[in-house]
Amino acid sequence: MPWLQLKAHIAPQHAETLEDLLLAEGAQVITLQDAHDDPVFEPESGTTPLWNETVLTGLYDDLEDIEPMLERVRQQWAAEMADEPCPEIDYELVADRDWEREWMDDFAPLKMGERLWVVPSWHEAPEPGAVNLLLDPGLAFGTGTHPTTALCLAWLDGLDLDASRVLDFGCGSGILAIAALKLGARHATGTDIDPQALQASRDNAQRNDVADEHLSLCYPERLADERHDVVVANILAGPLVELAPTLCAHLAPGGRLALSGILAGQAEEVMDAYREQGMLLDAPVEREGWVRITGKAPA
């Protein structure tokens, strides 16, 4: 059965409004993608992706009355958005395909550093003897596909984590905490403001045979007043600046720090905030416009 596909180019801050209108008119699925093919796969829960222009695509299985439906969408948009013009919505018929299989085919195992692989559940591990982290790709939380997550994973892979205690602040899927444990850490703590993130971390820990006694998960306000050998935070530049005193307070003397979720143009502001806390910082590492900042606490 063919599908009716609608597509519109829209400013990111207005994408949710159009998405809601199309869903109300029976869209089976809505997807959002960067218009310039540089997607942010891991936005914080409840936030808008950091794109200049978004391509919104909707699929419908009802092929009749498309023009009346679009007219209703335009009228409702005008009622809700005042002077903001409704974006142009194009449509076409597309052949029926195995959408789930095509989505799965887009994701292959990813190697992070020298030892670590992130492996989707439907793939065989390319190197069974390597450190294999089983994690399926998703949009809400880190899965290794985004440069910021990849930068943090590669950094962890390069550390000697044997018997260390690790804090993953803003843990999302738990990917960084779980990776640290599989790379030799004695204990990891993951903290996040989103209960869905904490649940995702629990689920992924179980999938990777992480014992409960090696991983603690909590909200930030319940974080124990203790120091860690390694602190990693892959969030956003603004919160990282605000959290500088907190994150540094959780570092043991000589402990290692990694920060990401930072656009290249924001790096200096973030680095200044951590220099003020006495951190000894390395040169930032950039990938696809995003940077990782690492450093060491004074001994």
Swiss-Prot record:
Keyword Transferase annotated: yes
A GO term, aspect molecular function: protein-lysine N-methyltransferase activity
Cell compartment(s), UniProt: Cytoplasm
Function: Methylates ribosomal protein L11.
InterPro entries: Ribosomal_L11_MeTrfase_PrmA, Ribosomal_PrmA_MeTrfase, SAM-dependent_MTases_sf
E.C. code: 2.1.1.-
GO cellular component terms, semicolon-separated: cytosol
Residues reported in the UniProt entry to bind S-adenosyl-L-methionine: 149, 170, 192, 234
Gene transcribed to yield this protein: prmA
One Pfam entry name: PrmA
Principal place of residence: cytoplasm
Record key words, sorted: Cytoplasm, Methyltransferase, S-adenosyl-L-methionine, Transferase
Protein name: Ribosomal protein L11 methyltransferase
Enzymatic reactions: L-lysyl-[protein] + 3 S-adenosyl-L-methionine = N(6),N(6),N(6)-trimethyl-L-lysyl-[protein] + 3 S-adenosyl-L-homocysteine + 3 H(+)
SUPFAM superfamilies for the chain: S-adenosyl-L-methionine-dependent methyltransferases
Family, similarity comment: Belongs to the methyltransferase superfamily. PrmA family.
UniProt GO BP: methylation
Native organism taxonomy: Bacteria, Pseudomonadati, Pseudomonadota, Gammaproteobacteria, Oceanospirillales
Domain of life: Bacteria
